[in-house]
Design a protein with these regions (language model features):
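HAD-like aspartate-dependent phosphatase fold
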Residues: 1-215
Length: 215
């Protein structure tokens, strides 16, 4: 079996290139060296470069995020599809296999996935017909409830400017009680991205860390 030195060796063999994001051109904090150049060259040669990302963000949000980092549609890729897009299509088509229309979002809010649809995001888990499992993160107050785990939290890069800080965790302990309570309800759980871990670069600097995710 031949092991290729890099993507550039085989890119010219194909008309359409399907490219994952995390671990392919993005390491959680920066672009892998040479990755953007290879993608740009493929686009220049007329290849269709489609990014397939399992982020729960909608593609429009991901496009804007990568623009801020230096990657641009039409220059480095031609198409961008996310797990959030696919989930959103199922929502709009009312194809979720759940007993009602009330959704409780556990974790970081992702209300945009359900906006302008037949489904309603409810603030209380007791009102829910199903749970949507979003990104497990903690507010500062929630984080401080676990003083013995203080060295296991990192300021999330997903904290939007002007919003209260959100913290990623290296351990699952802070989330177990609330998940157990949901499990006891016996309701369906929905998840657009069941990754167990993701290497994320802390917002306040440092190397990417293997933080807990939805899986």
């Amino acid at each position: 079996m031949k092991i290729h030195e890099g993507f550039a060796e085989i890119a010219d063999r194909f008309d359409v290139l399907l490219v994952d994001a995390y671990g392919v051109f993005w390491d959680g904090g920066r672009f892998f060296p040479g990755s953007l150049e290879v993608m740009e060259e493929a686009v220049k040669k007329g290849r269709q470069v489609c990014i397939l990302s399992n982020t729960t963000s909608l593609s429009a949000d991901s496009v804007r995020s990568y623009e801020k980092k230096g990657m641009f549609a039409g220059r480095h890729y031609t198409d961008f599809v996310t797990s959030g897009d696919v989930f959103r299509e199922a929502v709009l088509a009312e194809k979720l296999d759940i007993p009602g229309k009330n959704i409780y979002i556990w974790g970081t809010p992702r209300a945009a996935l359900f906006a302008d649809s037949a489904y309603r995001v409810v603030p209380d888990a007791d009102e829910a017909d199903a749970f949507y499992i979003s990104i497990p993160q903690l507010t500062t107050e929630e984080k401080e409830a676990f003083p013995s785990l203080s060295g296991h939290f990192y300021l999330s890069r997903l904290t939007a400017e002007g919003e209260a800080p959100l913290w990623d965790s290296l351990v699952t302990e802070p989330f177990k009680d609330s998940l157990l309570q949901m499990r006891q309800r016996g309701l369906p759980a929905l998840c657009a991205n069941p990754d167990y871990r993701a290497f994320e670069k802390p917002k306040d600097g440092g190397e990417p860390q293997p933080v807990v995710r939805q899986g």
